[in-house]
Structures are given as structure tokens and as C-alpha cells.
């Protein structure tokens, strides 16, 4: 499939809709994000782009981390560590202003899927 056909297939859709359509036709997570970046000419926030810092709740010497940011004026927060809805290594908890509550114990890929809904 050439890029013009892909643009026609995905044209006028939100980033999340594009992602879901690409997954539905068999693209991998990373390939879907790369295609969306090419079509929209936007650099999407990937998990590796998150800047984790010590979480303010580090009162008991157990490592807790958090990252936060904004996309198009919409905020997101990702946390991990003891008692924070993820181990901070493989699983994390994410909250965005579009969600009604935090989503705990999700993978790095799932964090990216939630964050792209802010575009």
C-alpha cells in the first residue's frame, strides 16, 4: 500500500481512529505510530520520551516515579512504584484529563495507546 492510499484510507480521522484502523488491518503498534507520524507530520509522544522523576510520595524509601506532560493543552500523568498501580518497571498507572479515573497495571504500549487519544 502506498502512502497516498494510506492517506485516503485514514484521512479526516483522529489519531486514535487512525491507530485503531491500522491495528485492525494488521499493522503492529510501532508501525501504526510511525505511519501516523508520517501522515500527520507530527511526532507522537512515545513511552521512551516520558521524563520520569521521583514521585512526591517517596516518604518510605521505596522508589516511586512519575512523568507528566501536555498534548494539545490536555494533560497526562504516568506513575509507577509501590502502591501506585504499577511496578514502575513493566507496569504503570496512567491518568489523563479525558479519563474518569486512573487506569492501573498497564504496559508501556498501553500507556502510549492512551496518550495518543490526546492528539
Where would I find each of the regions flagged by the language model?
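Mixed-charge, Lys/Arg-enriched low-complexity segments
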Residues: 41, 95-119
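Hydrophobic beta-strand residues in large extracellular and virion-surface proteins
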Residues: 32, 69, 76-78, 92-94, ...
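Intrinsically disordered, low-complexity regulatory segments enriched in Ser/Thr/Pro
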Residues: 77-106
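Short Gly/charged-rich anion-binding patches and loops
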Residues: 17
Amino acid at each position: 500500500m502506498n502512502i497516498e492510499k494510506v492517506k485516503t484510507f485514514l484521512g479526516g480521522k483522529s489519531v486514535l481512529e487512525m491507530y485503531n484502523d491500522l491495528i485492525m488491518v494488521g499493522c503492529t503498534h510501532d508501525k501504526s505510530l510511525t505511519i501516523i507520524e508520517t501522515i500527520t507530520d507530527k511526532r507522537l509522544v512515545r513511552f521512551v520520551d516520558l521524563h520520569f522523576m521521583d514521585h512526591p510520595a517517596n516518604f518510605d524509601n521505596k522508589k516511586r516515579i512519575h512523568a507528566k506532560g501536555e498534548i494539545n493543552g490536555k494533560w497526562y500523568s504516568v506513575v509507577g512504584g509501590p502502591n501506585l498501580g504499577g511496578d514502575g518497571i513493566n507496569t504503570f498507572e496512567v491518568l489523563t484529563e479525558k479519563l474518569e479515573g486512573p487506569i492501573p497495571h498497564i504496559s508501556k504500549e498501553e500507556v502510549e495507546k492512551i496518550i495518543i487519544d490526546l492528539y
